[in-house]
Amino acid sequence: MIHEGQLEVFDLTLIAKAPVFIGSGKSYVKKEYVFLTPRFARVSCDEVMLLDETKFFHLLLERKLEDKYTQFMLGAQTDLYRFLTAECCLSLNDIRAVSRYSIAAADALDAGHSLKEINAFVRGADGRVYVPGSSVKGALRTAILTDWILSDNSPHSAFGDTRKGFPEGTYLHTLKLKKDRNGAVLDDAVNSILRGLSISDSLPVSDTCMILAGKIDADPDGQTHRINLCRECIRPGTALHFKLTLDQSVLHQKITAESLMNSVRTFDSFYEKAYLRHFIAPRHAAEISYDSTLFLGGGVGFFSKTLTYPYLGEKDGLQAAINELNRSFRKHRHEEDRADGISPRTIKYALYEGELYPYGLCEVKLS
């Protein structure tokens, strides 16, 4: 830790215990990436290669292949590698020369050409993967508020019925920076105590630490359902490095390094007690310890992103969650969740090296 006046600067390390996905909003359809397998290419494992559009089109023009490529894009064939090698007579080295990056396909695609659209991970202007500090702060916010709510014995209103959302101002908007014309402190994000907590973006993540991962939903009885979805993810075991700064001129010791870690552990305990206990571990589930962990990024599920259950308790939280999910996903029959005692009634898993991992789980270390 470094002290700079009222600032306390810590090294924050998140170790991916499962595939982590933070989407850029971009995606690649089947005809926009090259799928390589050891059977057909000189690679050690299944691999996906993303092309640099500018370099690729220069190559097509140089080899006078633009008409063939147009026919390919309009036709039924979807295997870009086979098209480029068999019909365009390009070598693997030719293709690599116009690629942006390659990542391991892992368990997400197979040699049977079950090609899927790939959701891309966020990258910086230099093309390298990174984790935005705002994503980590959002995960810590959930842990902090879960801890504070569970420590608050005052009665809580059923916000799930009013549709007004969680009253975070009660817990967070405690500063006096913005007031109305009468001098009353406003319930406004400008007054959030979390202004005193900042997290840098992560150091860049190498493409060798990236994999493709699909999505598998698991029911309370352990039954699984594969979803036709594919994401660029950070590989389990990867360490992500950030700087976390606490401004005690704002926080006044309300949030400290010790209290942050306590909040993380409180969230873990509540997650296991209120949510995970309703589920039988599916077949091939990896052995996971929920100790000093956070759920980071996309695809981690409703419970990890919301405060419905800690605020309302399990009984009222169940009904509020059903109401909220019914409004957002009318076709999913969330009224049936009541019979399972939990809503939503699925846990989101990623398949990696033959085992199922809960999406986004990261171990937290502060030093």
Pin down the residues of each PLM region.
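Basic, Gly/Ser/Thr-rich N-terminal segments that form RNA-phosphate-binding interfaces in CRISPR RAMP
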Residues: 1-367
